[in-house]
From Swiss-Prot:
This is Temporin-CG1. GO terms for biological process: defense response to bacterium; defense response to fungus; killing of cells of another organism. It is found in: Secreted. Keywords: Amphibian defense peptide, Antibiotic, Antimicrobial, Cleavage on pair of basic residues, Cytolysis, Fungicide, Hemolysis, Secreted, Signal. InterPro entries: Frog_antimicrobial_propeptide. It holds the Pfam family FSAP_sig_propep. Disulfide bonds: none annotated.
Amino acid sequence: MFTLKKSLLLLFFLATINLSLCEQERNAEEERRDDDERNAEVEKRFLPFVGNLLKGLLGK
């Protein structure tokens, strides 16, 4: 019975570590994805502003 408890405890411990590592990796991936989306939003807002500014300066 003691051997069974040790085995189950070891399995539980390894599964907990595995889940923790997966969660950290998932969070890191979400942060990278959020940065990419944020950069795309900045480009969308910035490029029309520059275009309008150039049109105003060139008088077209």
